[in-house]
UniProtKB/Swiss-Prot annotation:
Official protein name in the record: Fibropellin-2
Organism: Strongylocentrotus purpuratus (Purple sea urchin)
Pfam family of the protein (one): EGF
Residues in the signal sequence: 1-17
InterPro entries referenced in this protein's UniProt entry, alphabetically: EGF-like_dom, Nephronectin_domain
Residues annotated as domain EGF-like: 48-91, 107-152, 178-224, 252-293
Family matches, as SUPFAM superfamilies: EGF/Laminin (SSF57196)
Organism lineage string: Eukaryota, Metazoa, Echinodermata, Eleutherozoa, Echinozoa
Origin: domain of life: Eukaryota
PROSITE patterns reported for this sequence: EGF_2, EGF_3
Cystines in this chain: 52-65, 59-75, 77-90, 111-124, 118-137, 139-151, 182-195, 189-209, 211-223, 256-269, 263-278, 280-292
PANTHER family cross-referenced by the UniProt entry: PA14 DOMAIN-CONTAINING PROTEIN, UROMODULIN-LIKE
Keyword annotations from UniProtKB, A to Z: Disulfide bond, EGF-like domain, Repeat, Signal
């Protein structure tokens, strides 16, 4: 009925455009108002269908009626039941669907606390990171979460990609270590770490706090306890860092051969878990060929300015060339 009235008003408005432009403008405003009211009615109807009542159980005894952010209520269904139509209550899954697929879609990679369904390659633990607490699989080294809530092995391409990501994590570790320096003659690690000499990176030879497990470097050079959320977040980062180590040591990115000079005389070929890799000496770092190269120092500000000017000149010449074309 509302759409018919809108159509009539629109037709009348079109016929009177030439007579009165002001009237046409008013008709357009009225038309927009009626359309907005119709959209609000549709949204209200849709939201009403998705609500349950807080004082009654309309979730078919297979879920809980929970109050949402805006004062509305909705059904949080138990596994493997799902919210269905027309009353948005909890219904069993359709026939012919695999339990594993239902679990993957409804639980979003969750595992069950009383079962071991991480494919034998992880541990099912309660996660508090994010908006909701839930059980998830913490996969072992070399495995990742899959679409079915378990753990699957990384592919070679995934491992190679993670190796590049982990190199940035090494820079993050250098930055964090430089903020947590200490003095050799004092104990200012807040009794939660050890003040040691740094043997790698830009700050090699300086003293830093190596904090105990569960602590982190603070802005005062000591060690402060991590929060639960920080520990869980760093645990996720550590898995990627472990993957990078796996790549460098087990996938020939940094392998060397014992008894040969594969480290360019600037490092030592060491053995770990049956694999060999280069441990570079002071002032050297690993290169893409698996050997050791001198650490490149940052260019001076004058060199940076000259490079910037040359870059601007090249861009200017390129722009002129494109205009001529």
């Amino acid at each position: 009925m509302q759409f018919n009235l809108v159509f009539v008003v629109a037709v009348i408005g079109v016929g009177m455009v030439a007579a009165d432009e002001n009237l046409m403008s008013k008709l357009q405003m009225a038309l927009k108002s009626m359309l907005n009211e119709n959209e609000e009615l549709q949204m209200q109807s849709r939201d009403t269908k998705g609500q349950c009542e807080s004082d009654t159980n309309k979730c078919n005894n297979h879920g809980t009626c929970i109050e949402g952010r805006w004062g509305t209520y909705y059904c949080k269904c138990e596994m493997p039941f799902r919210v269905g139509i027309p009353d948005s209550s909890c219904y069993p899954p359709p026939e012919g669907k695999k339990d594993l697929e239902i679990e993957a879609r409804d639980s979003e990679n969750r595992c069950l606390s009383d079962t071991s369904n991480c494919d034998g390659h992880g541990i099912c633990q309660l996660s508090t990171f994010g908006r909701n607490e839930r059980y998830i699989c913490f996969c072992a080294l070399g495995f990742r979460n899959n679409n079915y809530g378990g753990c699957s092995p990384y592919t070679p391409r995934e491992i190679e990609f993670l190796s590049y990501v982990a190199r940035d994590l090494e820079l993050e570790m250098l930055t964090r270590d430089s903020l947590g320096r200490c003095k050799s003659d004092t104990h200012n690690c807040d009794e939660a770490g050890q003040c040691v000499t740094k043997t790698y990176g830009r700050y090699a030879g300086e003293y830093i706090c190596v904090c105990n497990h569960g602590y982190r470097n603070n802005a005062y050079g000591g060690c402060s306890p991590m929060t639960t959320r920080e520990i869980e977040y760093l645990d996720m980062l550590a898995r990627e860092e472990q993957m990078q180590m796996l790549v460098r040591k087990y996938y020939s990115l940094s392998e060397c051969s014992q008894g040969t000079n594969d480290c360019n005389e600037n490092g030592e070929c060491v053995e770990e878990d049956g694999k060999y890799w280069c441990e570079c000496g002071e002032g050297y770092e690993e290169n893409e060929d698996g050997g050791c190269s001198p650490i490149v120092t940052r260019a001076t500000e004058v060199d940076d300015d000259d490079f910037a000017e040359r870059k601007k000149e090249i861009m200017r010449q390129l722009a002129e060339f494109l205009q001529e074309e």
